[in-house]
Amino acid sequence: MKRLNRILFVLSVIGIAVYGLAPERYFKDMVFPLQESMILTAYDDRDDGGMSRANLSTTDADSSLLFSCTLHTGESPAWCGLLWSFAPDSLLHYRNWMLVDSLVFDVDVQGTTEFLIKLWTFDPDVTDPENKFSFRPLIKEVTVEKEGRQRIVVPISQLYVPDYWYESQKVDRSLELKHLEGAARLEISSGWNMKRGKSFSLKIYSIEAKGVSSFALGLLLFFFLAIATIAV
């Protein structure tokens, strides 16, 4: 028994050493600058009778993206935003963001204290590819504490599915998986409390989805489970 315990102790030390020396697997997927197969568009409410005005341009000097918008002052709903389509032509091009733990924005914000981000994912239990609203929306209100260029990190865990989606799409609320393996679109839009008639702008230098794989940790835990089983 003592010999077995010594062997298990040595194996435990070896397991910890291997875990410590194993390289971490970093994951990074760029949203901007654009990758092949991605399509970026700016939108506003003019096609639906509104008078909001969105503008999108690029800056040659630093390869940044400049988006600006002014919401109309009428009584009807107003909106504007940016939309990245990751797979405009094929389900095969959805981004697999299972390893993503945060979205990182390098952006210069002017004229607003909040903007919304919305990640649309393909839910095999719900989504009809012909109905863009049937994709699962994961949203987050991003608070901007100051104007100017800044690095904003949004943990993916803070994105949530709004109640109105379950109601409008008649989806069972027990279906809670985010389905990050099928990231289809990313959207940035004006905040809920954006003032009408006031212009705001986002100068985007980069957007990336980042994460670290827990594969090595999983192997270590499995290794210790095997040792515990042998010891018992």
Kindly give the residue locations of the regions a language model identified.
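Beta-rich carbohydrate-recognition modules and glycan-binding surfaces
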Residues: 1-232
